Amino acid sequence: MARIGIFPASGALGTSTYTNLLSQVPNNQVTLINRYPEKVPKKYVENGVTVRQASYESSAEDLEAVFAGVDILFLISYPSPVHLYRTKVQTKALNAAQKAGVKHIFYSSLAYALVNAESAKAVVMAAHLDSEAHLKQLARANSGLSWTSIREGLYAESFPVYSGLPGFNNPPSTIRIPEDPNGPGVSWVRQDELGEGSARLIASYAKSPSTFEYTNKIVTLSGPKSWTWAEAVEVLSRVTGKNISIEKVSLEEYKNQPQMKAYFGTEETANTLDSAWEAIRGGEAAGVTTTLAEILGREPQSFEKTIEECVKKQASQE
């Protein structure tokens, strides 16, 4: 079997993906690359997993060296909404992978655009579109390279970030958002199921590249339905047992809520919210596909069930 690499093998999506992947493929065929390889659980290393040290801040030469010998690479996008820097470091990594001889690149994109669209309103999507375009260009110029872009849906676990909540428990009596509560919503999806779905795609390609149906294609993994903000708040009310209303406010009022300033820190980052809500208003976060269900072999977990889990988890930590 081909050697599989994950970079960076850290964070929620990276950890979920390699944890699921290691139950599907021989561990001695997997290379995990991250900034702190010593943090990879020892049980995986003892089972044959190779660990290497690198990050997006590594030089192009160092990235090429750690990608050497890897046939299939899962490149997880750089965790920043800053467009140009994100594009710069991801382009460097993609070029290094091609030079190292990687044969197929899976890229973790974002489902913040209409399904299969090549343009989007959300600034946070811009670097993903750049990287998808660069992958296509690399593949056209190099016959030995192919790609799959996995557009991952918005995490249900991130609902508090968008809705301006300090957390899942003890929500305020009124949630304030800069949008019509009954307008286009979000097809929320459980984060670990995105990791599992990504792992299954990688394992499927590794086992039979010639029959893999998503070669040189974009695949969108979403939740099973789109929830309006009013519906989502109803779920939170039901799960927490509290009567919560939702109110449309101006974008400035929304951004000036203390919890939003705490989430986003800098004005530059907070300003990505302007385009994010424009995208939501245009239905660009509401796309639903059956692909994740087909890959998992079951219906993805409902938004309500995931919120229940999040509320219980947070309560146990308080």
Question: Predicted regions: what is each one?
Answer:
Residues L221, E231-G282:
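Terminal hydrophobic/aromatic helix or amphipathic segment near a protein terminus
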Residues T291-E318:
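Amphipathic terminal alpha-helices
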Residues K39-N47:
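Short loop/helix-cap segments at secondary-structure boundaries that form the rim of catalytic
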Residues E64, T91-L94, Q191-A199, F303-E308:
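Short, amphipathic alpha-helical "lid/cap" segments that border enzyme active or binding sites
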Residues A2-V40, E57-A60, P81-Y85, A100, ...:
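Oxidoreductase cofactor-interface core, primarily capturing Rossmann-like NAD(P)-dependent enzymes
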Residues V66-I105, L129-Q137:
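NAD(P)-cofactor binding segment of oxidoreductase domains
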Residues T50-D71:
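Conserved Rossmann-fold cofactor-binding substructure of NAD(P)-dependent oxidoreductases
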